[in-house]
């Protein structure tokens, strides 16, 4: 019979000594740390008589401490939690409305260090005094970054970005007030018209969430190829293939970079090419791809406002050896729409929809607001409506007035 432990067990009120004895039984590493083995160890370890429910609760806690995320396990299992941060013993959590200090804390900085080292080691990577920081992807998709002292001056520090098992749909984002209902129709029209777009914003603003949601709107008969530094996008779409970067081995060889992956993706017959985060020379390959028949592509970019996007593209283009004038020419032809995400005190919101245009004698790229959360439809709304109509897409009601 298969033993299943509670995924998010309630607090166990039994003896901490009993839990410690059970942990020590597995400390040698010779015994398999399976749910059934932990339950058996709880029953065999001398102590107070426990009912089945308490046995399962204690076993779940011990199992999580040995192979899971320890005291952070319940937080990572909470579907509302997006980020869990550990500063030595302090635990901070973001549930979509900003960081909040949790009543929970790590037992000691050493306990935080041991947890970080165990989680990183389970992914085949190293975290110790000789390699004091590491990135890892946990088996459930959670992204982990850990830094040890003395590099972490008050650490250790752990940063965990959770993986949402049931991604948000566009309906969900409307219900959460991330996207107003009329703008949801506009976003659907952008995808249907195969307009290439960038989702921009600061760290933790919801860029990946919105991109994942919009990918799900791609017609089911199209093939989507994802290129990411670390796999985060999990769209509910029947034909998605993904590529992710690979770090070098201990000899410093074997790394696979984003630029390599974009070029490989172009050989995989993509109907839509999606670059999870443009932060280097791969922007050059993406723009070239979008200009050679791969319409409807998308990506994310760190930028605090739509007006900052051209300068950000310039900086990334230089990393790929693309001169300023050539970068602007490529971007003007390849990109049509920019979506600005922002994190507020009440949650993450879509703040602006911008239209990419080339202006002036040098034909430099600008991004003009077509819709703004504070002011509504803006000057470029009419141009966006005409572009959608030209592409054969239904112009959403939001832009009806602007179209005339």
Indicate residue ranges for each PLM-predicted region.
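N-terminal accessory targeting/assembly segments
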Residues: 1-127
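P-loop NTP-binding catalytic core
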Residues: 78, 92-193
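P-loop NTPase switch/communication element
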Residues: 164-175, 212, 216-263, 309-313
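P-loop (Walker A) phosphate-binding loop of NTP-binding proteins
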Residues: 190, 202-203
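Hydrophobic anchor at the beta1->P-loop junction of P-loop NTPases
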Residues: 199
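Conserved lysine of the Walker
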Residues: 207
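Conserved P-loop NTPase nucleotide-binding/switch module
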Residues: 228, 235, 265-340, 345, ...
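NTP-binding/hydrolysis catalytic cores, primarily Walker-type P-loop NTPases
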Residues: 347-404
């Amino acid at each position: 019979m298969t033993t299943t432990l509670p995924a998010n067990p309630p607090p166990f009120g039994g003896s901490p000594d009993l839990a410690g004895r059970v942990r020590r039984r597995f400390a040698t590493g010779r015994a398999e740390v399976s749910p059934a083995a932990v339950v058996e160890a709880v029953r065999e370890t001398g102590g107070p008589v426990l009912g089945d429910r308490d046995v399962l609760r204690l076993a779940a806690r011990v199992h999580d401490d040995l192979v899971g995320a320890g005291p952070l396990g319940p937080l990572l299992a909470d579907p509302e939690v997006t980020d869990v941060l550990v500063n030595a013993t302090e635990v901070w959590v973001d549930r979509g409305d900003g960081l909040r200090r949790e009543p929970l804390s790590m037992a000691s900085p050493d306990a935080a260090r041991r947890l970080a080292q165990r989680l990183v080691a389970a992914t085949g990577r190293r975290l110790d005094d000789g390699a004091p920081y590491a990135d890892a992807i946990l088996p459930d998709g959670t992204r982990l970054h850990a830094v040890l002292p003395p590099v972490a001056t008050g650490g250790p520090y752990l940063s965990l970005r959770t993986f949402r098992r049931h991604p948000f749909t566009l309906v969900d984002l409307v219900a959460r007030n991330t996207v107003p209902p009329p703008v949801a129709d506009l976003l659907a029209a952008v995808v249907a018209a195969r307009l290439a777009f960038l989702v921009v914003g600061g760290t933790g603003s919801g860029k990946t969430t919105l991109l994942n949601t919009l990918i799900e709107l791609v017609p089911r008969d199209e093939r989507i190829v994802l290129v990411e530094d670390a796999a985060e996008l999990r769209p509910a779409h029947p034909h998605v293939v993904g590529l992710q970067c690979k770090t070098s081995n201990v000899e410093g060889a074997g790394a696979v970079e984003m630029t390599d992956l974009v070029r490989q993706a172009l050989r995989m017959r993509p109907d839509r090419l999606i670059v999870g985060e443009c932060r280097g020379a791969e922007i050059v390959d993406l723009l070239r791809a979008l200009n050679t028949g791969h319409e409807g592509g998308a990506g994310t970019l760190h930028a605090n406002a739509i007006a900052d996007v051209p300068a950000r593209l310039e900086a990334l283009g230089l990393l790929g050896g693309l001169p300023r004038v050539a970068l602007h020419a490529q971007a003007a032809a390849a990109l049509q729409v920019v979506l600005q995400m922002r994190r507020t005190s009440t949650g993450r919101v879509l703040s602006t929809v911008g239209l990419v245009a080339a202006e002036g004698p040098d034909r430099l790229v600008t991004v003009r607001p077509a819709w703004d959360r504070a002011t509504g439809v803006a000057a470029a709304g009419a141009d966006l409506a005409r572009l959608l109509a030209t592409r054969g897409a239904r112009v959403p009601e939001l832009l009806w007035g602007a179209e005339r």
